[in-house]
Amino acid sequence: MRYSPHSPTEVEEMLFSIGMKNKAELFADIPDRLKLGRDLELGPGLTEMELNRHLKELAGKNMNLDDYPCFLGAGAYDHYIPAALDQLLLRSEFYTAYTPYQPEISQGILQAIFEYQTMICALTGMDVANASLYDGASALAEACQMACEGSRRRKVILPATLHPEYLEVVKSYAISGKMEIIMAPEQEGIIDKEATLALLDRDSACLVIQQPNFFGCIEEIAGWEKAVHANKSLLIMVVNPISLGLLKSPGEWGADIVVGEGQPLGNPLSFGGPYLGFMACSKKYMRKMPGRLVGQSVDSNEETCYVLTLQAREQHIRREQASSNICSNEALNALAASIYLSLVGRQGLVDIAARCHQLAIYARRQMENYGLSLKYPQAFFNEFAVELDDPARINRLLLEQGIIGGYELPGALLLAFTEKRSRAEIDRLAALIGGECR
């Protein structure tokens, strides 16, 4: 069937209805120098088979993670995604980014979101989780805003070890004037505890700790909760969900709000998005939580049902008085996360986290064999920074050799290791970097 959107008669009728004689008159406001003035020079049409071949040729110009081992992390990670995930995710019942506006006829997706919230709570050790936010950075900004509004304080203490893009997003929220950002210093790759505690005062709404932090280092969490709560401030933790397969949960550390980037949970890198932000908190703060919340209830027949609960917090009801302006969210990505966690299971997540950590330990040894040193003398999960004079040059070299290198820091290269990497790939990485730096 040919695509014929409007017949000449229909075009004439539309022009007549707006008082125009012809199409040239309709576009008279556009300067002639900006008009093409000729027909498009399109080639002959392609068959489906020819078009498929052509698109594959174009796609072949991209760097494919199936062909290029990737050691780039810094917030987004190349984890393996089980084949079953996409088959379930792309079912027509699920294939939307929206949380439903008519929940009584959308029980399937509501239950899926409820299961996602349950898994996030189990993972973080918190009481309540929402149906997702846009990404990890916006989740942190929302958490800081939540802390300020709940405590009626303005100061948000952010560490120098926080992901710089997260910092920029929080700064964009602070433009409103309701939030004042106070930066806490770092010492050897982790938060300077003594200097940071000295920043706490009566107007401090919260302290943020990223674990592992942007540099890959494991922060010393012990003692923070007691000091922060003694000041009647909130402790917000930013976490890598995969790391929770090995590390203590934020709930065990006494965190009040937990946020993070959910991309490692079954979501592809996908040129930077879409991703999802997860958020969980203690029950006492749930009425200040942004975004949708799905709850379990019973219907008039005493059957289990699922509902959007505590909607009075949201902007479609309270407008400018809402806890947040977030509306449509990343429900499809959240569903991917819940399918991923269901497929790998509790022990599977532990195994994935352990393999990531073991490969990072192995990589450190291989780097040290070539005389390379880590920038920071701290424990790490699956990411560390290697000291290099010119990390950009090393990255170019690696790319020429078919390897996607790390994130460039001043005088260092931040490298990430996931369960997809092999020891042979790490050996080659270390040999290329070490050989070039000798």
UniProtKB/Swiss-Prot annotation:
The keyword Oxidoreductase applies. Pfam families: GDC-P. It is an enzyme of class 1 (oxidoreductase). GO terms for molecular function: glycine dehydrogenase (decarboxylating) activity. InterPro entries: GcvPA (IPR023010), GDC-P_N (IPR049315), GDC_P (IPR020581), PyrdxlP-dep_Trfase (IPR015424), PyrdxlP-dep_Trfase_major (IPR015421), PyrdxlP-dep_Trfase_small (IPR015422). Disulfide bonds: none annotated. One of its GO terms (biological process) is glycine decarboxylation via glycine cleavage system. It catalyses: N(6)-[(R)-lipoyl]-L-lysyl-[glycine-cleavage complex H protein] + glycine + H(+) = N(6)-[(R)-S(8)-aminomethyldihydrolipoyl]-L-lysyl-[glycine-cleavage complex H protein] + CO2. The glycine cleavage system is composed of four proteins: P, T, L and H. In this organism, the P 'protein' is a heterodimer of two subunits. This is Probable glycine dehydrogenase (decarboxylating) subunit 1.
